Amino acid sequence: HWPEAYWRRLIETAIAADWPVRLPWGNEAERIRAERLAAGLADATVLPRLPLAGIAAQLAGARACVAVDTGLGHLAAALDVPTISLFGPTNPGYTGAWGPRQIHLASDFSCAPCLAKTCAYQPSAAERERFDLERDWPLCFTRVDAAQVWQRLQPLLDEAHA
């Protein structure tokens, strides 16, 4: 998972720039995470449980999408929604969403992309202190931060707004 602190910072940055944020989810753990991310933010909305067609309808009206390497990013690409896709242990060359206005941000972690289902990386004491290893794992996702994503997302939003 991309670190929750990064998601929160990105959401706050988007809202500060007058871009409301909608948070979809697919299972109970994702719903709980979305609620934590939206807590206290008036312009961050956790969507209700939606079937795939409902998620597609939400995406079709979006100015842009940010997703980890999941079906959400591929669905956004299929709908021609500008998308930033985040890659940690996976390789965008193998599984990246393709199409116009699709941007892949991949980790530069020394062992990424490892393509492993289970991370074998041994975090340092400093990493253990800095990150919540229950939520911010694998650590390769920590190498792409919210500022980097916003730097690439903002032009897509500006283009969509023009």
Regions found by a protein language model. Name each.
Residues 38, 46-48, 77-161:
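Nucleotide-sugar donor-binding patch of glycosyltransferase catalytic domains
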Residues 4-93:
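Donor-binding and catalytic core of enzymes assembling or modifying cell-surface/extracellular glycoconjugates
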